[in-house]
Amino acid sequence: MSGPVIVPVQVTDTPARIREAARFGNQILPDVSRTFAISIGFLPGMLGRAVLTSYLLCRIADTIEDDGTTAPETRAQLLEEFLVALEEPAEADAFPARASGLKGDAGHLALVARTDLVLVLLRSLPRYTQERVIHWVREMALGMAKFVRNYPDGIRIQTLEEYREYCYYVAGTVGCLLTELWHEHTSAVGQREFERLWVRCQAFGEALQTVNILKDIAWDAQHENSIYIPAHDLAAHGSSHDTLLSPQHIEHNHKAVAHFIDLARLDLDQALEYMLMIPRRALAVRAFCVLPLLFAYATLRDLSGSRAMLTVGGTVKISRREVKSLMIAGLLAMISNRALRRLVQRVKARPFTFSLVAG
């Protein structure tokens, strides 16, 4: 699902403007995602800037897609205008005003309001890096616009194939982009390593997304008017999109969701293999990957026995104590494939905590 190579317009931003953009990016990141703020902090120099920029651009697109209060055609048009802004500096400066009517999380809206600064960061990257970031953000945003237009009354995934397609657009693209950035900016990821990683990079991105979809079933249905569990699978177990959060159908719905938990487990195992293929010399890249992966395994473990994500107002979250324990254990284990496999097996089985770590 690739398109033409996009060559961004080259302009010269002042050093002061680039510093302002870098400060903004680093300050807004924890308001958008605490987990990725930690992970991106491990990445050095231009690689860190490239991943920070890419992540913020993806979250801008995601914020547009998720606003269920704005008309679908308006959101689709905003996504397309956002893509124009990636390549045209004048459009970049005008975009925040065009998107000012969006509703959503305060941190995400603050990010959208300074899209112009994020695009200054984009223009500060090496030329080839800019091209690859634009290529994959374009792939993501066009896919989002497609689903917004296909489901003007709220996304209602119908089949497993459509579920996979959606996950590719919103997350598989991220795995592809990150892998290209590892190759370009990390000497330890040469052509041979890149080719091996490329086979599983889409699964790496999609694995984390599928866990998020499963833990946020109720939130997405209530607050974003989006249901990603396919109608076909719900119907096979005697339920439907209309009864997804019905207490009377909770066991029917859990049987349908159990299949997607199994699929997510397979995806996560592919994502683990992806990480284990990253050369141990690329410690920063391993550090970036390990925490989201461990958190996803822990969340999926809890999802397997929970019904909370299928109740109004419910969600599934691992404890703060386990988060802190996994941060310590993950960073210690990441240098050894054997130790990391052991840790994953432990996390799959039961909550992982250190007795000395406070909640």
Which sequence ranges carry the predicted segments?
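Catalytic cores of Mg2+-dependent Asp-rich isoprenoid enzymes
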Residues: 1-207, 214, 218-359
